[in-house]
Design a protein with these regions (language model features):
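Nucleic-acid endonuclease domains
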Residues: 1-20, 24-116
Length: 116
């Protein structure tokens, strides 16, 4: 099953809606998430494996609104956005926690503890 007519970037596909889901994760406090120049998705999920700054069994899941990604300025000197870097064939990199989750005060859609 593919969405958007492409085979790019999907880690999972929602069997009910057919949406392509890209999953990003980090196991350190300050993530540096990388996207490919042709990355596409219908739904983006960020998995924080260290929500308290260290890996302790807690895992928090966030759904990230795509509209919050494409216009993020990643290079202030050149005023380059995420989309600009993709169009240049580059791999945009930034901290989803610092640029989206924390400033927007996003709440996890799911929290689990592997130790319970």
């Amino acid at each position: 099953v593919r969405t958007n007519g492409t085979a790019h970037s999907y880690d999972a596909v929602d069997k009910i809606t057919g949406e392509g889901i890209q999953i990003k994760s980090a196991s350190i406090k300050n993530d540096c998430t990388s996207f490919g120049p042709t990355s596409t998705w219908d739904k983006l999920i960020f998995v924080d494996l260290a929500p308290f700054g260290e890996v302790d069994g807690n895992i928090w899941f966030y759904e990230i609104d795509s509209s919050n990604i494409y216009n993020i300025v990643l290079n202030y000197k050149k005023n380059e956005t995420f989309r600009d870097q993709q169009l240049q064939g580059r791999r945009p990199r930034f901290s989803i926690k610092d640029k989206i989750i924390n400033p927007l005060r996003l709440v996890p859609i799911k929290k689990i503890n592997l130790m319970e």
